[in-house]
Amino acid sequence: NELNPDFFADTAKILFELCVEIKEKCGVRIEFTDLGGGLGIPYRPEQKKVSYAEVAQKIRKIYDSIIVPAGLDPLKIFWECGRPITGPYGWLVSTAVHKKHIYREYVGLDSCMADLMRPGMYGSYHEITVSGKENFPKDCVYDVVGSLCENSDKFAIQRNLPRIDIG
């Protein structure tokens, strides 16, 4: 999940140079290159969306300086953009079914990591919205957990959220 435009420009430069090297050493003209995936989306509120225009401008500049002089123009460029196409458009709707008050405040949901694996598997961040309290102060700190008996079944750890009620 990369948000830095320079990452993609650096990747394109490496691939374009490889295309030129293959042509020079093997006499093979590459018809396309695949920049792969990784084009990110902001998961956290403080993250900024990657500028596609900036990424395209940087890649175009590198293309014009490497591919065109090497006689490989036109070179098709593919990109696997699954995350920006699908990532921002899914919602997991859950209900708080219990609370536990010990050394931390826990909120248990009727969902589990079988419904959304990324937080439990990689500790990835996903925004949590408390329905009807979108503009309320986030003055409570919760561990939001799933319904499996599994220590990694967590949606959020020590997350500032509005007060969550059961139901």
Name each model feature, range by range.
Residues 1-100:
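Active-site loop/helix belt of alpha/beta enzymes
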Residues 58, 67-68, 72-166:
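Charged (often Lys/Glu-rich) extended helix/loop segments that serve as interaction or gating elements
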